[in-house]
């Protein structure tokens, strides 16, 4: 079954584990299965209509999000019927194409990592991007399916896979920022959109908005659940509230990791501890913290495959003080807040006052 986003775990998980721990065994063990999957994706262009016999006319897609066309809440249907909206079918095919591009990029990277020729997948990634621009995105950065222009997740995926550039990208970013503002600086994303939300915003110069979302307390937000007693990550943004009690009782898990992906952003961006994709296993570390006074301080330690990495920052008056440790045998590219140039640090402990 080709459930977009879920089926892609067969490619995304091996790539992620390899990058995190530096061991190619998981890539080698799964290469044949990943290659077969990608051949099927390529043959069908991951198109929902083409794959309808496998999937039925349904996708989980951006599950339990608040946007139009969401499947669980039946926004993908013509109101009062079981007829799937053509806009929803088009949306599913667009998201699938974005995963096709993402998967192909990861496959090329993994091929190179295990000594294989990456050209097949480099070419496939280029074809997927060309397909996205031909079928789904106008030259000005708007979506051909007009309802997607009112949503957050479609723009996030276009930015994630670098399908838009130049003025088209700038226009999409401006529209995305306006969308957040129109929703009171609240996210509207579900499982898939949230998985790339914070990192994509930061990579595209919108870390300020990422922090707005992190500190948001209205529904939907991470702190809404915390304010309502959560000690775990919930499946739904509004799974419970003190005012209304338990939300929808069907399929309402209170221990469901999907939205826990924000922790990756906290470690990589707030704390500034990220693996360099070019050197798996934290042998080279990207340390680029993005502080915010509302957070107050960060004290983080990560026992990586390369050793213990530390990052702790705090404010003292007008000064920002950062202490960090690069483990023995590793190196780090360090970029200070507000700067673009990085500096190479060898193993050791350091303090910077800015």
Map each language-model feature to its residues:
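Aromatic- and histidine-enriched alpha-helix N-cap/loop-to-helix transition segments
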Residues: 1-12, 29-32, 91-102, 149-153, ...
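Well-ordered alpha-helical scaffold segments within catalytic/enzyme domains
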Residues: 10-26, 98-116, 156-167, 196-205, ...
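Carbohydrate-binding/catalytic loop surfaces
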Residues: 1-5, 51-93, 140-161, 192, ...
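Non-catalytic C-terminal accessory modules of carbohydrate-active enzymes
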Residues: 122-123, 208-354
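Active-site acid/base region of carbohydrate-active enzymes
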Residues: 20-99, 113-156, 167, 216, ...
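Solenoid-like repeat scaffolds
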Residues: 146-148, 178-186, 216-223
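A glycine- and small/hydrophobic-rich beta-loop-beta segment
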Residues: 172-175, 203, 213
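Alpha-helical repeat scaffolds
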Residues: 169-177, 247
